[in-house]
Amino acid sequence: SGYDFYTRASNAVWISGAGNLTFGGPDTDDKGFAMYRDNQKLEDGVIATKVLETHPQFIDNGVISGRYPAYTVVQGERFTAKIGFLPLADGTCGTGNVKFQLNYREGGGSVTPLGEWTKTCDGTLRSVDVDLTPLKGKTVEFILAILANGPSTQDWAVWVKPQIALP
């Protein structure tokens, strides 16, 4: 049991409003990008490992999402992660402001939301924790998504250690 969204990020299907994206960047791609950002200092000033950056398309209210290979949820499992932003080069917060979303799809059906968190760059990371009990025994594709609130230029959104595990 268990599912590591960081390790499996290269197996996810990443898309933005501009179409399909290749995992791994480059971080200059105006269509948006998803890539590893290990051992980078985050907005809280701490250097983190297992950091997945998901930057939305560089337009107002841009989006990006990654649909992961199917997983069968085990009784008692939870989705956990810390969410936040990469800071500016000088370590201060930029204008990052997004909605982080955890969604899922069952059997190619419609996308169903599991959690949504609005976050601005404020010098802290936020811990998220979602009980997956309603999905126990179901085989679903989880989707990590970022929706920009307004301009997306500095939406260097990161998921730290995103995973499904038993507590």
In which residue ranges do the predicted regions lie?
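Gly-Asp-aromatic-enriched flexible segments
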Residues: 1-167
